[in-house]
């Protein structure tokens, strides 16, 4: 009898537990497929890839207006529904999962602070697709979330408003990452007599106009874009010295037709941009620099670049800020050619296409972007002969980094990158040093805690690469930028001091080879910065003479030594005119507190031992 009573009690207890569980479920609003649309429509947890044993992760960018998308499932005992139901069985009840189109709110939190509430739009109000294309979804509710709410620590809770009692979801935690501004300098190069009249006026080349910046902000994964003319403003030079390249010796050219191949001038300009970034203390920053090339051919008329070149935070090409520009700045942020990357196993989508990438979204047009070509695309006609196809035999877009420029719809300035490429761009910004102008301090991003922290620059690797993380010791001061070349084997025209560039710029730490205390710091193996001269030696010095005959010496972190042998043998090919070992390009900034009247390049072998007043003069220029 006791056993029977116990069994009855257990049955009743289990029934109560089940009923309680069901009722508890009924009070929970069930959500799924929650997504954020920025450059791409991605799950709130982000998206990851593992390629060649390396993990790539795309997250939601902080401080960027975003479209929130969500589907709802309502679980009810009654099973009432106006749309299809999915039925499951339990031992006691039949529960129907119903996809509804009720009215819903979302409350956005940041940690324990409520940022605000938004009423979600019904699925029939979802933004359209470019060129009236296939609808992205007919089930997602959506709403724009202001950028101020999109930050690490974000959490979402959804509420159903159609029942007699309020039903709420569990908290959902979007994976929000770094917020950052893509700051971009533009520095037009007017070469070989090019000017505002015979090419393009400076007011059209000095900066990216607002409409183009707005378009760029939708294809690059960033919080916003800040495009500014570089402090140097413009470069006007009648000649350009090209270093040895592709087995050919260096040369001085005075028109674009003298170049030996299509990329020679662009490579020369990129190398100068590298020096400018270093001289301005931006080598470890995420600041981009792009140089529109305006040069004349042998006929004295504008010669198009017909392409571009980019990498390592620099880019150059034509002045139009269009397809070439967006592609080269992709290289500048670390993106390779997508087709080549796929072949090497470092890009996930076949032949550099977008097959497998998430759809895109453009907030300016308020449209979704399909991964397939629209019928308004320039490349739509005949695409079946060259483009990758999806399962419905539709042409799939190519990445911007693999011949995809013409795949965009006709009313768009730029075509699409893949979602994977955005993860590379995000990683590029994570490792950079930022200057906070409001507080006058440097900061870096800490991904673990999801915030910036104050960063104090230090000299790493015993000064092998740079001092003080390459950061300026003085900012926003008047400077002269000195650009020079020197050939160890000649001819003489390859050794040049370019016309000076004056601007409001920055100054990095430098050493004076006439100062014994400073030279003691960089003496190989014994100084406190013992590897400063280990890359190629410290064998050259710039001597600047001002108009009052005062003199300044700046030791260059450049030499003619073999790698890791600052006191050892010269480079193996220093006498070969076709080798880069025989050529020197340098860029430094000096204070413009006085007018410069002469710049000299001196040979000062192993300068930490001190330099002679009669050091060998290699080249000079009077101003």
From Swiss-Prot:
What coarse category fits the chief subcellular location reported for this protein? secreted
Localized where? Secreted
Q: Where does Zn(2+) bind?
A: 327, 331, 337
- Stored Pfam families: Peptidase_M66
Stated family:
Belongs to the dictomallein family.
UniProt xrefs under PANTHER family: DICTOMALLEIN-1-RELATED, PTHR39540
Protein name, as recorded: Dictomallein-5
> Gene encoding this polypeptide?
dtmlE
């Amino acid at each position: 009898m006791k056993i029977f009573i116990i069994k009855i009690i257990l049955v009743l207890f289990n029934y109560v537990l089940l009923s309680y569980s069901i009722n508890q479920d009924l009070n929970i609003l069930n959500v799924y497929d929650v997504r954020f649309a920025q450059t791409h429509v991605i799950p709130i947890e982000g998206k990851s890839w593992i390629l060649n044993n390396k993990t790539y992760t795309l997250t939601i960018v902080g401080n960027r207006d975003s479209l929130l998308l969500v589907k709802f499932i309502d679980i009810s005992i009654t099973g009432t529904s106006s749309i299809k139901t999915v039925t499951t069985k339990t031992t006691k009840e039949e529960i129907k999962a119903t996809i509804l189109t009720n009215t819903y709110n979302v409350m956005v939190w940041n940690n324990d602070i409520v940022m605000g509430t938004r009423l979600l739009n019904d699925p029939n109000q979802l933004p359209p697709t470019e060129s009236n294309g296939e609808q992205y979804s007919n089930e997602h509710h959506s709403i724009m979330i202001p950028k101020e709410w999109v930050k690490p620590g974000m959490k979402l809770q959804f509420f159903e408003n159609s029942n007699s009692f309020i039903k709420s979801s569990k908290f959902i935690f979007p994976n929000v990452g770094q917020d950052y501004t893509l700051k971009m300098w533009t520095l037009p190069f007017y070469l070989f007599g090019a000017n505002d009249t015979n090419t393009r006026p400076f007011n059209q080349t000095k900066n990216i106009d607002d409409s183009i910046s707005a378009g760029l902000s939708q294809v690059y994964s960033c919080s916003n874009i800040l495009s500014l003319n570089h402090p140097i403003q413009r470069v006007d030079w009648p000649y350009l010295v090209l270093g040895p390249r592709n087995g050919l010796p260096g040369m001085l050219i005075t028109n674009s037709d003298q170049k030996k191949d299509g990329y020679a001038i662009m490579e020369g300009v990129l190398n100068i941009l590298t020096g400018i970034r270093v001289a301005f203390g931006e080598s470890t920053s995420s600041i981009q620099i792009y140089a529109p090339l305006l040069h004349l051919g042998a006929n004295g008329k504008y010669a198009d670049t017909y392409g571009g070149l980019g990498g390592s935070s620099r880019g150059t090409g034509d002045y139009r800020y269009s397809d070439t520009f967006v592609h080269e700045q992709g290289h500048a942020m670390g993106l390779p050619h997508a087709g080549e990357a796929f072949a090497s196993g470092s890009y996930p989508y076949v032949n550099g296409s977008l097959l497998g990438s998430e759809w895109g979204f453009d907030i300016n047009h308020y449209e979704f972007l399909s991964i397939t070509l629209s019928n308004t695309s320039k490349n739509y006609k005949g695409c079946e002969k060259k483009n990758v196809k999806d399962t419905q035999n539709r042409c799939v877009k190519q990445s911007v980094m693999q011949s995809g420029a013409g795949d965009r719809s006709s009313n768009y300035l730029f075509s699409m990158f893949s979602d994977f490429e955005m993860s590379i761009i995000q990683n590029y910004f994570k490792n950079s040093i930022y200057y906070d102008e409001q507080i006058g301090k440097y900061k870096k991003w800490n991904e673990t805690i999801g915030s910036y922290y104050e960063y104090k620059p230090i000299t790493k690797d015993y000064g092998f690469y740079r001092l003080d993380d390459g950061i300026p010791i003085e900012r926003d001061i008047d400077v002269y930028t000195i650009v020079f070349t020197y050939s160890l084997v000649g001819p003489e025209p390859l050794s040049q001091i370019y016309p000076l560039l004056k601007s409001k710029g920055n100054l990095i730490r430098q050493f004076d080879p006439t100062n014994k205390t400073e030279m003691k710091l960089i003496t190989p193996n014994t100084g406190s910065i013992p590897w400063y001269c280990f890359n190629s030696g410290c064998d050259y010095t710039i001597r600047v003479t001002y108009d009052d005959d005062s003199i300044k010496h700046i030791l260059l972190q450049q030499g003619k030594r073999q790698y890791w042998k600052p006191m050892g043998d010269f480079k193996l090919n220093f006498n070969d005119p076709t080798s880069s070992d025989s050529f020197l390009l340098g860029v430094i900034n000096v204070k413009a507190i006085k007018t410069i009247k002469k710049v000299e390049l001196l040979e000062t072998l192993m300068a930490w031992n001190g330099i002679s007043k009669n050091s060998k003069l290699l080249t000079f220029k009077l101003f």
